[in-house]
């Protein structure tokens, strides 16, 4: 305490109201990060005072009056913690509550302090038999600990927690295990005050006197935390009531008595003391606190006054303070003349940049009590009066008990209007003349412009939620082409965890990831849960589909079955309240780590680093340096995802500092330097540690998580063209440099450094307009880098699940804080542009096709025979007959409407149960070489035994006689046949391929349901009827058998070729349909066995398919569009 220290200001604290009596101050403390002094009173009210003048800043009710006085404060960067007898309160410094924690176990809490986890966790205790650990972020009790003593004060010093007991003892607790490692006897009564700093602990307390009961001891006890021994006490003859250790001078303490006498002493030399006296007049001292900076202290008296002492020239509270946020200054409105003729729009609106409070989100708006419907005028004009009112004759214009909608919410601009079903369009086109058809086509073109409309928040409609609608014909009747007229396929929704669609699209259009995924998929990998294989299958399907809709069901099913996906909150069903932007960023980190690990399992690495690691890994060395002793430890570090870190709020708000560029943000994020508390092996205690990364190399694909959490970061992204489409990176002697714009061009012109140029491939964006829309994710992707044309131009597309549209680059990279923000960004080296590697097609590992994988003995050769490598190796054009059987894994969801109609919300979900593939030609034509039963691990709703031939137990590995294999095992065989160029022959294959989740080009499909079809009859014929009518065979007598169905389809194809060669195809088809009309298209003796079970679509049974048909032309492609087989020359 210097000579110029004196009392600077006295603040009177009184509760709200007109002249109420003063409420005693129960505790107070200086803020550790801002120029604030916090006080709490006996009624639970918390008040803060700002700066040396002690101006009132905030005041709020932290605890109920019944909870008693506020006992203690603790401070974090985000807020203020306070504790009372039965509750713990956490609020922002502005007074807004973050959480308030109560529990029946909180009976008499007294104190709290931070644990070894820093400000993330606190330990609370009191005069009761339990202590509690509380998570500060979540506001929940995470652990309950039994305790033998009752604690009243708790202080932390280094690795110890010092707790004063109710009986005057001091317990020294280990901050990690919270076990008592030393007990001191401090005072014979209770302890009035205690403080600990560095290596010293000082206490004041009470002792009993014969005549005066309990009195303050005339000394202060001192203990060494270094040796855990008691030192000589410091005398203080007027009675030591309060003691505080100086925050900067480790051996200096300030002792105060209740009458206001203060003494500054050196614990190592107690004889040299500096005395001061506080003028208290008619009160006594109730509290004493030292500022963290050591430049001020405060005293509270019994009259609710706070006295601030310090040097007028140096006084400040924390050592390093952050700016305190104040309310905006309200500008008084200008005076204006007001009359009845003054228009209201002259008042105007204040400038605002956030959603107004009056703009309620859609999920908070509810319709209650619709107005009654208006009575028809014809009824009112014919009413007759009676004693009980009026009555009129019913005009019979409405149905009985018909519900009338009297309030329609205007939602036309909030969601995309679904198109007509294909069956509706087909029926409508048949009834229109040519002129009317052109008019309808023009109207549909105008309807397509609806995708370019905007909602009430200026959100383009193409960003809205898209949903699949289902008619009685199932999903095949939905017009996906309305949403996508590009050569790039979208991904369907209504699949669990389909929020990952946007990220999977981003991987598919990143050539380096795409090439390695397909290279791994072509390897002999047979791990059941390999996500990299599933990613390769999905990418190959998207490329082959070339604009047709696809679904990622197999990938998402494998992903959902991973146990660590649940613990990381990556599954929608287990994380309903987690924001999608957080889930997709966590998924990005998880998938990159997983596929890198899986790639290393199959393909060799050089020096421990695989090709996938070189593509994805940022190699770095992480160093941790102790701020106290400068001891430094270095360890290797690598990461697949770099998370962007933004400047602090006060830096972003400073208008004199220029806004940071994207390259500056990226540099600070990659070289991320943090300060945190950690264990120093040299100091042998927790110290402030400085963490820093030294970059060794950067990958070919730079994956970034936007990690936007503050409003200032959102405003940064809203700056036009803030996100560059090209960046340059230089790594030199461990330093990471990033450039963009003119700086990048300048470095490229100079050519001094080896600079890697990256181009932006795409962005996953979070869309949250709030207008009757659920938050969802979209991807804006530049398809130019993944084009096979070396000179392909940049073309940006929006991928909103199955909606795909070309958009300008400006629109793709435009972000709005209110509804569109980036989540994941992908940059790829420009040297990898257009490097599409298809060499995997020549390196397919086909060993799975020639081996018997079951432990059961091989079936007889007349029932099953594996392919012979030398004579039967699959080749382009080799025909194979295929049929699959399915089971129902989930029932359909149906909504019954008030008018009695039903609408399918989500169709039933089926799973592959058995797949059989037979030879299509050669000596053993018709003999199967694949007949796999698929093991099922999830619950089966219905085995559909009558239509699938699958019985309970057939798909269980423990009980099945068929040795079922994994879905991936069976799928890979079909995938290999597809990429070897085989032609698949079967009946109604579209539904089979969709459930299997594989896309086969039309040139490789021979579908007998399309061969024996006349468009004029609008009905497709089932396999059993065709076998009876064309082949004169009876099939499916007892149950369905996939081998029998596949060989029957093969025979029908051969018979079709005979009809074509003989030139009698058309009369034969007419005869077949004529015969079918006579027997109702059922094979005699079949009864109703061929009717479909509830929930199965017509496509799967070979019935009427709603897709629009055109007259086939001879020589066209196969599959219902042409007559010639792809096998014929």
Swiss-Prot record:
Signal peptide, first to last residue: none
Keyword terms: Cytoplasm, Exonuclease, Hydrolase, Metal-binding, mRNA processing, Nuclease, Repeat, WD repeat
Protein family (similarity comment): Belongs to the peptidase C19 family. PAN2 subfamily.
EC number in record: 3.1.13.4
Regulation: Positively regulated by the regulatory subunit PAN3.
CDD domains: PAN2_exo, Peptidase_C19P
Protein name stated in the entry: PAN2-PAN3 deadenylation complex catalytic subunit PAN2
Highest classification ranks of the organism: Eukaryota, Fungi, Dikarya, Ascomycota, Pezizomycotina
Region (Linker): 320-457
Subcellular location: Cytoplasm
Species of origin: Phaeosphaeria nodorum (strain SN15 / ATCC MYA-4574 / FGSC 10173)
Gene: PAN2
């Amino acid at each position: 305490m210097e000579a110029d220290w004196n009392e600077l200001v006295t603040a009177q604290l009184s509760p709200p109201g007109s002249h109420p009596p003063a409420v005693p101050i129960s505790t107070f403390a200086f803020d550790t990060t801002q120029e604030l002094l916090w006080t709490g009173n006996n009624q639970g009210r918390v008040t803060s005072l700002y700066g040396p003048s002690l101006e009132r800043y905030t005041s709020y009710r932290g605890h109920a009056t019944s909870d008693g006085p506020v006992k203690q404060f603790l401070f974090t960067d985000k807020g203020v913690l306070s504790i009372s007898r039965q509750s713990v309160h956490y609020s922002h410094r502005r007074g807004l509550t973050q959480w308030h924690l109560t529990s029946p176990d909180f009976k008499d809490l007294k104190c709290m302090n931070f644990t070894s986890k820093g400000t993330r966790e606190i330990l609370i205790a009191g005069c009761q038999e339990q202590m509690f650990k509380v998570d500060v972020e979540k506001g929940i009790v995470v652990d309950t600990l039994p305790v033998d003593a009752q604690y009243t004060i708790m202080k932390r010093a280094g690795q110890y927690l010092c707790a004063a007991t109710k009986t005057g003892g001091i317990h020294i607790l280990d901050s990690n295990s919270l076990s008592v490692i030393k007990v001191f006897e401090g005072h014979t009564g209770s302890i009035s005050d205690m403080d600990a700093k560095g290596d010293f602990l000082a206490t004041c307390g009470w002792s009993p006197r014969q005549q005066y009961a309990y009195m303050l001891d005339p000394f202060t006890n001192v203990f060494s935390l270094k040796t855990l021994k008691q030192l000589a006490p410091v005398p203080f003859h007027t009675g030591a009531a309060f003691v505080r250790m100086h925050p900067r001078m480790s051996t200096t303490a300030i002792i105060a008595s209740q009458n206001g006498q203060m003494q500054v002493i050196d614990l190592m030399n107690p004889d040299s003391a500096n005395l001061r006296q506080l003028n208290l007049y008619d009160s006594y001292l109730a509290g004493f606190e030292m500022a963290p900076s050591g430049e001020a202290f405060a005293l509270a008296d019994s009259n609710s006054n706070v006295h601030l002492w310090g040097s007028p020239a140096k006084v400040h509270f924390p050592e390093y303070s952050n700016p305190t946020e104040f309310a905006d200054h309200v500008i008084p409105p200008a005076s204006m003349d007001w009359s009845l003729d003054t228009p209201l729009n002259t008042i105007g609106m204040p400038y605002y940049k956030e959603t107004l409070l009056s703009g309620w989100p859609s999920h908070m708006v509810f319709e209650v009590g619709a107005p009654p419907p208006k009575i028809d005028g014809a009824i009112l004009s014919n009413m007759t009066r009676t004693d009980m009112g009026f009555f009129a004759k019913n005009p019979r214009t409405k149905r009985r008990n018909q519900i009338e909608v009297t309030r329609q919410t205007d939602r036309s601009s909030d969601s995309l209007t679904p198109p007509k079903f294909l069956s509706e369009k087909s029926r409508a086109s048949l009834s229109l003349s040519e002129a009317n058809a052109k008019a309808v086509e023009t109207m549909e073109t105008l309807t397509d412009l609806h995708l370019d409309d905007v909602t009430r928040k200026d959100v383009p409609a193409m960003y809205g939620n898209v949903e699949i609608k289902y008619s009685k014909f199932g999903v095949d009747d939905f017009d996906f082409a309305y949403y996508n007229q590009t050569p790039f396929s979208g991904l369907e929704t209504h699949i669990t965890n389909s929020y990952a669609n946007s990220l999977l699209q981003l991987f598919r259009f990143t050539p380096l990831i795409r090439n390695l995924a397909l290279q791994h998929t072509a390897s002999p990998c047979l791990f059941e849960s390999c996500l990299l294989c599933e990613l390769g299958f999905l990418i190959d399907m998207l490329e082959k589909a070339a604009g047709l809709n696809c679904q990622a069901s197999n990938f998402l099913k494998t992903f959902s079955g991973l146990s660590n996906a649940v613990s990381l909150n990556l599954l929608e069903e287990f994380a309903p309240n987690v924001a999608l932007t957080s889930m997709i960023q966590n998924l990005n980190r998880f998938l990159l780590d997983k596929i890198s690990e899986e790639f290393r399992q199959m393909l060799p690495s050089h020096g421990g680093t695989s090709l996938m690691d070189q593509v994805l890994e940022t190699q770095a060395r992480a160093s941790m340096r102790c701020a106290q002793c400068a001891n430094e430890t270095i360890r290797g570090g690598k990461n697949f995802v770099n998370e962007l870190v933004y400047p602090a709020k006060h830096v972003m708000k400073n208008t004199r500092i220029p806004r940071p560029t994207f390259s500056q943000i990226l540099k600070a994020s990659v070289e991320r330097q943090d300060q945190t508390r950690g264990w120093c092996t040299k100091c042998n205690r927790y110290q402030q540690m400085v963490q820093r990364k030294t970059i060794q190399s950067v990958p070919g694909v730079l994956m970034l998580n936007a990690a936007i959490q503050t409003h200032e970061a959102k405003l940064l992204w809203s700056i036009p063209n803030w996100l560059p489409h090209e960046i340059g990176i230089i790594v030199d002697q461990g330093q990471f440099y990033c450039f963009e714009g003119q700086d990048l061009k300048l470095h490229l012109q100079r050519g001094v450094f080896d600079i890697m140029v990256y181009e932006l491939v795409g962005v996953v964006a979070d869309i949250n307009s709030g207008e009757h829309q659920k938050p969802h994710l979209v991807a804006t992707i530049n398809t130019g880098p993944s084009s096979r044309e070396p000179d392909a131009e940049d073309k940006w597309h929006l991928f909103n699940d199955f909606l795909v549209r070309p958009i300008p680059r400006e629109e793709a990279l435009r972000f709005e804080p209110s509804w569109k923000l980036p989540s994941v960004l992908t940059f790829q080296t420009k040297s990898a542009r257009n490097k599409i590697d298809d060499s995997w097609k020549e390196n397919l590992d086909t060993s799975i096709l020639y081996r018997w994988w079951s432990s059961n003995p091989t079936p007889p050769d007349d029932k099953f025979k594996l392919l012979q490598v030398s004579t039967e190796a699959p080749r382009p054009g080799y025909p194979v007959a295929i049929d699959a059987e399915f089971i129902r894994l989930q029932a359909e969801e149906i909504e019954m409407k008030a008018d009695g109609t039903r609408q399918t919300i989500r169709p039933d979900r089926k799973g592959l149960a058995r797949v059989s593939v037979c030879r299509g030609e050669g000596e053993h034509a018709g003999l199967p070489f694949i007949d796999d039963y698929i093991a099922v691990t999830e619950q089966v709703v219905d085995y559909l035994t009558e239509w699938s031939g699958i019985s309970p137990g057939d798909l269980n590995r423990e009980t099945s006689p068929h040795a079922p294999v994994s879905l991936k095992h069976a799928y890979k065989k079909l995938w290999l046949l597809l990429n070897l160029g085989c032609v698949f022959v079967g009946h109604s294959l579209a539904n089979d391929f969709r459930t299997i989740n594989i896309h086969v080009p039309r040139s490789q499909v021979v579908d007998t349901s399309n061969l024996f079809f006349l468009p004029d009859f609008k009905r497709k014929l089932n396999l059993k009827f065709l076998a009876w009518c064309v082949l004169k065979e009876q099939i499916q007598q007892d149950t369905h058998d996939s081998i029998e169905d596949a060989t029957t389809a093969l025979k029908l194809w051969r018979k079709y070729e005979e009809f074509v060669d003989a030139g009698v195809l058309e009369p034969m088809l007419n005869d077949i349909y004529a015969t079918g009309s006579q027997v109702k298209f059922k094979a005699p003796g079949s009864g109703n066995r061929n009717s479909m079970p509830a929930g199965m679509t017509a496509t799967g049974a070979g019935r009427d398919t709603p897709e629009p048909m055109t007259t086939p032309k001879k020589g066209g492609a196969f599959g219902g569009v042409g007559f010639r087989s792809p096998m014929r020359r």
